[in-house]
Amino acid sequence: MSAQLNRQIEQAAGWIAASEHLVAFTGAGISTDSGLPDFRGPDGVWTRRDAGLPPPRWGKPASHIRPNVAHHSLVELERLGKLRFLISQNVDNLHLESGFPLDKLAELHGNGKLMRCLACDSRYTLQQVGWDRREWGEGYRTQRPLEGQPRCPQCAGRIISSVVNFGDPLPAKEIEEAFTHSERSDVFFAIGSSLVVSPANEMPRVALESGARLILLNRGETPFDALAHLRIEAGIGEVLPPVVERVKQLLGAGAHTPGSGTH
């Protein structure tokens, strides 16, 4: 690990240890070490499409995809009492599988393993409602309901996949929570996202306008590079575990490094 990267890890850990309302924001880049492709990386879905190439192959069968050290690092930050809220653009369910609490998570594009009720907005796993995709399909909003398909256990409303497809409305509750916590944040940590998709790309701007420090951890450029207080271009799995370990050391020592306090 280079001296520069060590300094960046130390700086990020100092700000996180001193923070009162840390918000993390994750994109597809956090899941590449689990075997999923990203979108705008060197071998990403959109990068290959723009070059006239076929989509990238998944590194593992879907049934073998598991949370990686980066997902578990965010769980540790939450359990330390530092990470107050997590915003994610991902639908891969890896944050929940890693043990991150649902009530502190806004999945802006839904979750491929969860269904939700159109009437009361309750969310369920496929198993909780007995949704068999071989019988009922994916359950997207645009699909015609089938006779006898499972209904919401709470209100008997229609349940659909929580995944947001093109043309679907974004989940209002999650969007509202994401903006609220972005505005409250004193450190906004964007991880593995190119920050170009709206309205998610407005959240770091809201955080900056509210006085938060912006940390970017991403391979490749983002529209916020010049505005970030700290930009780390390195592997996510290489950076997050030592950041968390350093945060633990700082919290254990009761130390907030000089100049790393809230502002």
Question: What does each model-identified segment do?
Answer:
Residues 1-263:
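Conserved catalytic core of sirtuin-type NAD+-dependent deacylases
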